[in-house]
């Protein structure tokens, strides 16, 4: 995929933060923004314009983003309970999709996502926030350079209250 043309779905706190990140490098184009709240849609569209991109299409229904032929990639940052539904719609629409965590509520959801990938071949990624950060990438590079010797086991994590 040479030209990444993103449709952002979900522009609350986390989604807006991801949108800020996406428009900074300007390697990709944000061509659509979507949220159920019109004020968030307008704020998102204004942010994209502020960083020198064309004003994106603005939607309040994610189904409209799926129909938008200018979009080839979807970022889902909505409420958790809608992640799988929107991700599946994106995959079946042939749009690569990245979903903010949590990716699924039930095991069946996970199987549905795998099945959609197997049927469509559409790329899917969880946007886990502790995989590609500066610290994580630093440790990965240290491992690849052999600074720890042979790594036979590693564990890590963090805890925060999501209430």
Model-predicted regions and their roles:
Residues 62-66, 140:
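Short hydrophobic/charged patches on amphipathic alpha-helices used for structural packing
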Residues 1-51:
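N-terminal Rossmann-like dinucleotide-binding module
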Residues 33, 74, 154:
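Receiver (REC) domain switch-region micro-motif
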Residues 31, 56, 70-72:
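Conserved acidic residues
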Residues 44-53, 112, 116-120:
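Short, conserved SAM-binding/catalytic segment
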Residues 55-61:
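Conserved SAM-binding strand-loop segment of SAM-dependent methyltransferases
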Residues 10-12, 120-125, 130-163:
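Predominantly a Rossmann-like dinucleotide-binding segment in NAD(P)-dependent oxidoreductases
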Residues 73, 79-80, 84-132, 146:
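Beta-strand-loop-alpha-helix segment that lines the small-molecule cofactor/substrate pocket
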């Amino acid at each position: 995929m040479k030209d990444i043309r993103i449709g952002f779905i979900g522009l609350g706190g986390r989604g807006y933060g991801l949108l800020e990140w996406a428009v900074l490098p300007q390697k990709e184009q944000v061509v659509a923004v979507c949220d159920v709240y019109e004020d968030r849609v307008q704020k998102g569209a204004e942010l994209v314009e502020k960083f020198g991109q064309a004003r994106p299409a603005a939607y309040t229904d994610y189904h409209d983003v799926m129909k938008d032929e200018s979009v080839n990639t979807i970022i889902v940052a909505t409420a958790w309970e809608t992640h799988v539904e929107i991700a599946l719609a994106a995959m079946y629409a042939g749009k690569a999709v990245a979903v903010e965590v949590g990716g699924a509520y039930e095991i069946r959801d996970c199987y549905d996502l795998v099945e959609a990938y197997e049927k469509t071949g559409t790329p899917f990624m969880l946007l886990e926030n502790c995989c590609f950060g500066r610290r994580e990438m630093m440790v990965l590079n240290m491992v690849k350079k052999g600074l720890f010797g042979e790594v036979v086991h590693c564990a890590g994590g963090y805890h925060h209250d999501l209430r």
